[in-house]
Amino acid sequence: MEGETLGTFVMVKCNTSHSEADIASRIMAIDGEMKASMSIFDETSLLSQINRNECDTLDNHLIYNIELAERFYTLSSGAYDITVKPLTDAWGFGRDESKDTPNIDSILQFVGYDRIAIEDNRLVKQDSRTQIDLNSIAKGYTVDVVGEELEALGIVDYIVNIGGEVRCRGRNAEGKLWAIGIETPYDGNMAMDSIEKIITVDNGALATSGNYRRFYINDLGEKITHTIDPRTGYSVSSTLLSATVVAPSCAEADAAATMFMALGSEGGALELAKECERTLGWKYYFIYADGEGYKIECSEEYR
């Protein structure tokens, strides 16, 4: 089945006796649950209420993702940080698309994962102005929830793709591993919507993060990308155009891909990716701008 959810496309392929309408209704129910919990674009969501300090009680979805985010905050020495929302808003990548240069120093005073804590299922903030953005992990997490729903129905062969974040189990209709295409980034000289690499994933998940679609040019002619370094408050300047990660869960792959983009080419993304492959088994496929073209750094099996 194919359709739309979470503001993007959704594609599910599986071998099952359940009707497409049944599968679709289950996905839409999950979509509604995720939006009600974690959306920063729905003003009625629980996370939006928490960001406005109207409540502090967390549901299980928020607890899981906020705790998982701490792992990536630590791995990246703070480059990945879900409290980055005030900065992304200030740079024009939130609901308010104002592109005026913000007062970074004043905002940094209340940005930082170390300024929040979970106590008795409640979010405790050191500063009431701190706000959370889970967009870097929520879509991958939703893919996992959909996959787990399919597995609860006894479905063992499936692929779930929501906006390019993918989870797959078993084999396709031909009895082969699921094949997933990695998009070629568009960066001036490159063709849009072309496939750079097709890889197979064996009972895992894949996510890609990139800076080649969401950016703008400010009044000074500077390229401002949507990836903001929460440690400096400024847009990440990097030759790393996209980072694809294969991991056991899509939430992990989603957060890891964002983490590597936040670190960038100068911040040790490649070195950390190699370490994560060695210690955690994650695979990576990085595409860098390189003069008139691009270059690839990736796990050995993708070469």
Residue ranges and their predicted role:
Residues M1-R303:
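Mature catalytic core of soluble alpha/beta enzymes
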